[in-house]
Curated annotation (Swiss-Prot):
Part of the 50S ribosomal subunit. GO terms for cellular component: ribonucleoprotein complex; ribosome. The gene is rpmE. Binds the 23S rRNA. This is Large ribosomal subunit protein bL31. Belongs to the bacterial ribosomal protein bL31 family. Type A subfamily. GO terms for molecular function: rRNA binding; structural constituent of ribosome. GO terms for biological process: translation. The lineage of its organism: Bacteria, Pseudomonadati, Pseudomonadota, Alphaproteobacteria, Rickettsiales. Keywords: Ribonucleoprotein, Ribosomal protein, RNA-binding, rRNA-binding.
């Protein structure tokens, strides 16, 4: 391998709440602070289903607000 063309492979700390996970990476910063705990995501945790309901409510509100908007490109030209 050529010298000087590969990124530096170093220790990376991933902070989730009060937990710290250590791994190796080529990430330029040595630390990542997670805003959302992946262990509490509704896809893996059935107890936090209200997050999905809130998301569905937001989508429903959006659809109500923009129900008349159409991006259909199959309209006939006059």
């Amino acid at each position: 391998m050529k010298n000087g063309i590969h990124p530096e492979y170093k220790k990376l700390l991933i902070k989730v709440g009060s937990n710290i996970f250590e791994t190796m990476s080529t990430h330029p910063i040595g630390e990542i602070l997670m805003d959302v705990d992946f262990r509490k995501h509704p896809a893996w945790n059935k107890d936090s289903g209200n997050v999905v309901n809130q998301s569905n409510k937001s989508v429903s509100d959006f659809n109500k607000r923009f129900s008349g908007l159409s991006f259909d490109s199959k309209k006939e030209a006059s």
